[in-house]
Amino acid sequence: MKVWMAILISILCWQSSAWAVCPAWSPARAQEEISRLQQQIKQWDDDYWKEGKSEVEDGVYDQLSARLTQWQRCFGNETPDVMMPPLNGAVIHPVAHTGVRKMADKIALSLWMRERSDLWVQPKVDGVAVTLVYRDGKLNKAISRGNGLKGEDWTQKVRLISAVPQTVSGPLANSTLQGEIFLKREGHIQQQMGGINARAKVAGLMMRQDDSDTLNSLGVFVWAWPDGPQLMTDRLKELATAGFTLTQTYTRAVKNADEVARVRNAWWKAKLPFVTDGVVVRAAKEPESRHWLPGQAEWLVAWKYQPVAQVAEVKTIQFAVGKSGKISVVASLAPVMLDDKKVQRVNIGSVRRWQEWDIAPGDQILVSLAGQGIPRIDDVVWRGAERTKPTPPENRFNSLTCYFASDVCQEQFISRLVWLGSKQVLGLDGIGEAGWRALHQTHRFEHIFSWLLLTPEQLQNTPGIAKSKSAQLWHQFNLARKQPFTRWVMAMGIPLTRAALNASDERSWSQLLLSTEQFWQQLPGTGSGRARQVIEWKENAQIKKLGSWLAAQQITGFEP
């Protein structure tokens, strides 16, 4: 019962998310956006299938194709799930290529597996599909996948690939095999190295007119033997004996989705001889080959890896002012998952950097995780037809502005509060940006230290602050009064590192105000430029006013 409930919840969540990502476009706008992306994908298809080149990463192509399908569903212009590649060859496949249906997640895979037995998992090798036809023990023909029914004659090319056996015997002497021509790799770790655009590279090599030695950089992984031995173990043994050893090495029996998940995760992290983009689970029992048709395979499914980088739609562009007054640009995204992390925002950087990227709401950007799991922009992969970019705020802020609240200072003022509450400054646990905004909106702070005057009753009656949390906050605010003098000076934004400030041995506000530029310049890591900044800072009227206010509050080091 619990399993079926989990499946139902998964389906409902998927449906909800599917509807949620439908753009709020007029019919005319939808038609224009869909048409433009259709034309681009068609151009990429023509480049790939006819010329063997790719102007776009495989993962980006796959995700934008899925995005196009989603838009078509949203606006009633849905096309069949299986998109047939353009016909660019007249050689008929002895057995049609069926393609493989993708499973959304482990729950969907588990549901599919419950109805089947004698199941096996293989890596979903990333390359180009091929048919190998053997007659009387010799390689008779090699055919590109094409549209699944017909393809190009690749016989001469494949004969130059040393990894493909040219002669076979026994049951394989008169057989038709289907597999993947792949780019041979040494110790490829998918988790670290990604897809390296392997599919397009293989297609390019196979499309070249010259019979280059580079074809020996290709290998083959046979994943189907239509009308072959009934037992999978017999199939694998015969294939290995003939020279198709990879199939036996990388085909494992599985009983449930948990076992598939373990193998999938192991291959994701292991050193493999090829690039992969997931796993394929297949039943050993297959229908007769005469029943195989494109898009009709019910005996196998794929469970793809989550891409290292995801295509995300930009919903809004927002501007943030940091404590130093610098304006940064943040893109709010339609949520995507990256390595089990839900990503909804990505920092673009400065206004100039944003203008160089030329990013507007509605654009599609490629996002990945940098060090420490921080989202980053890798590329702008698609720009919308209608592009309206917001106007950035005037650059009127600097490191000495917005210690006191005002309408124009809202963002920098909040940034200063977030900074002073951080662990490395006053260590106010339990309050972040949202909490500071709630306090300031309710109590209208005069300056960055006004929170010291809040009473337990005021905190308890602050909308957005839970009553159970208000007592904890009041306790934190009181503890802050006992923080060392240097922590309070850091909270005031002195332009020095903590190491330099500690080395100064300043222990009172009056002593600090008397220190000269020469004194500051001799501190570690503090040059003449930084020393002048310290002088400008301590002579600033807002800073002097804050120092006097803290003295009135009898904060350590500020007392007269």
Curated annotation (Swiss-Prot):
Instruction: Give the catalysed reaction(s), semicolon-separated.
Output: NAD(+) + (deoxyribonucleotide)n-3'-hydroxyl + 5'-phospho-(deoxyribonucleotide)m = (deoxyribonucleotide)n+m + AMP + beta-nicotinamide D-nucleotide
Source organism superkingdom? Bacteria
- Give the annotated active site: 124 (n6-amp-lysine intermediate)
Q: What is its EC number?
A: 6.5.1.2
A Pfam family it matches: DNA_ligase_OB
The record's InterPro entries line, in alphabetical order, gives:
DNA_ligase_AS, DNA_ligase_B, DNA_ligase_CS, DNAligase_adenylation, DNAligase_N, NA-bd_OB-fold, NAD_dep_DNA_ligaseB, NAD_DNA_ligase_OB
Which terms in the Gene Ontology molecular function aspect does this entry carry?
Answer: DNA ligase (NAD+) activity
Q: Which UniProt keywords apply?
A: DNA damage, DNA repair, DNA replication, Ligase, NAD
Offer one example of a GO biological process linked to this entry. DNA replication
Described by its record, this protein's role is as follows: Catalyzes the formation of phosphodiester linkages between 5'-phosphoryl and 3'-hydroxyl groups in double-stranded DNA using NAD as a coenzyme and as the energy source for the reaction.
Stated family: Belongs to the NAD-dependent DNA ligase family. LigB subfamily.
Q: Tell me what this protein is called.
A: DNA ligase B
The scientific name of the source species is Escherichia coli O17:K52:H18 (strain UMN026 / ExPEC)
Q: Gene name, please?
A: ligB
